[in-house]
Amino acid sequence: MSIWIGVDPGSKGAVAAIYNDNGVQRVAVAGWDNMLFVSFCKAFKDRADENGEQIVAAVEKVGAVKGNGITGMFNFGKNAGYIEGVLSTLNIGYQLIPPVVWKREFSIVGKDKSASIEVCKRLYPDVSLLPTERCRKESDGMADALCLAAYAKRKL
């Protein structure tokens, strides 16, 4: 058995995990918060260690975003470094996956942000992509993270 983690490092990013629980596939998705990310990854790393499971993460490879400016690019890079630091510290293997690569896997290259939400609804219809109970709009960051976890399950 394995645990697959997907990480969308954007400002409205998220983290997701796909794992097995007594033979049943489960999915966990959480919005972005630095401390939540640490506890999320640590919980799954502990689970993997206890059960002799492998754990791997697919992290979206980030680059400069046109129109973000210098401060925005710096913060984006700082966040990406934080993610890699946490995964390395917890000894969770990871790969940086360019957006075009994982999107090609789900045939959504060049489509708008709602495309990943539609993929998740098709693959995991019971999973909520609402950041909070009060939200009405599904999070494309949570959908991207779940797609990255699904990509990891298929390819890593």
Describe the function of each predicted region.
Residues 1-156:
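Phosphate- and other anionic-substrate recognition elements at nucleic-acid/protein interfaces
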